[in-house]
């Protein structure tokens, strides 16, 4: 599966937030946006704002691809209910993101590696597809050998149980978590490292499909 291999710190500086949850905050060394004229903020057009919100959402979930955005929008646009919520849920409930939210990895990129390398189980069966959609009631756990990985033990040691989203449950001792219910829009938004206008993104994608 294709993945982003570009400069992550540059993206964090662009949006002014430690968006990937890295231990070393890249903004402490270089707080300004990248580029020769990083301090200068030009007024953006509506189209420019839509593009920026789209890029923010991609970054929040580990640099997801454009085609994944389009596919997710197509899957929810004709369904009854809150399109923005259903659209955002498509990314919040990705397996790699759930692994990250549970605290099995310190960053979304580390979570992606855990999944891709076959360390993660869904209802007791190995799933190595990062974009796998986790549904309520599904249990996420780690292989017994994988539980001794340094990236896992260090992350769980620092995981504050109070920071766990209300739609998840976690048994640290068993290295097991569960998606209890489908997350609401406001619950998902509170977990993002920076505010994202999902409605603007949906409006942008409506002209692309």
Curated annotation (Swiss-Prot):
Signal peptide: none annotated. GO terms for biological process: ribosomal small subunit biogenesis; translation. The keyword rRNA processing does not apply. Residues 22-45 are annotated as: Disordered. SMART domains: Ribosomal_S4 (SM01390), S4 (SM00363). It holds the Pfam family Ribosomal_S4. The keyword Ribosomal protein applies. InterPro entries: Ribosomal_uS4, Ribosomal_uS4_bac-type, Ribosomal_uS4_N, S4_RNA-bd, S4_RNA-bd_sf. Residues 93-154 form the S4 RNA-binding domain. GO terms for molecular function: rRNA binding; structural constituent of ribosome. GO terms for cellular component: small ribosomal subunit. Keywords: Ribonucleoprotein, Ribosomal protein, RNA-binding, rRNA-binding. Belongs to the universal ribosomal protein uS4 family. Part of the 30S ribosomal subunit. Contacts protein S5. The interaction surface between S4 and S5 is involved in control of translational fidelity. PANTHER family: 30S 40S RIBOSOMAL PROTEIN, SMALL RIBOSOMAL SUBUNIT PROTEIN US4M. One of the primary rRNA binding proteins, it binds directly to 16S rRNA where it nucleates assembly of the body of the 30S subunit. With S5 and S12 plays an important role in translational accuracy. This is Small ribosomal subunit protein uS4. The lineage of its organism: Bacteria, Pseudomonadati, Chlamydiota, Chlamydiia, Chlamydiales.
């Amino acid at each position: 599966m294709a993945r982003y291999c570009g400069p992550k710190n540059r993206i964090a500086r662009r949006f002014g937030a430690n968006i990937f949850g890295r231990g070393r905050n890249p903004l402490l060394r270089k707080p300004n946006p990248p580029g020769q004229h990083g301090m200068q903020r030009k007024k953006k057009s509506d189209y420019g704002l839509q593009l920026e919100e789209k890029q923010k959402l991609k970054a929040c979930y580990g640099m997801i691809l454009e085609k994944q955005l389009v596919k997710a929008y197509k899957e929810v646009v004709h369904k009854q209910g809150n399109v923005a919520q259903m659209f955002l849920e498509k990314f919040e409930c990705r397996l790699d993101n759930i692994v990250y939210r549970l605290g099995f990895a310190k960053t979304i990129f580390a979570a992606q590696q855990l999944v891709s390398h076959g360390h993660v189980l869904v209802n007791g069966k190995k799933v190595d597809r990062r974009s796998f959609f986790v549904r309520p009631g599904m249990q996420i756990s780690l292989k017994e050998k994988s539980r001794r990985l340094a990236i896992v033990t260090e992350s769980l040691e620092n995981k504050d149980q109070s920071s766990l989203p209300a739609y998840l449950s976690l048994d640290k001792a068993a290295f097991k978590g569960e998606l209890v219910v489908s997350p609401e829009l406001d619950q998902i938004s509170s977990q993002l490292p920076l505010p994202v206008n999902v409605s603007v993104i949906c409006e942008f994608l409506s002209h692309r499909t």
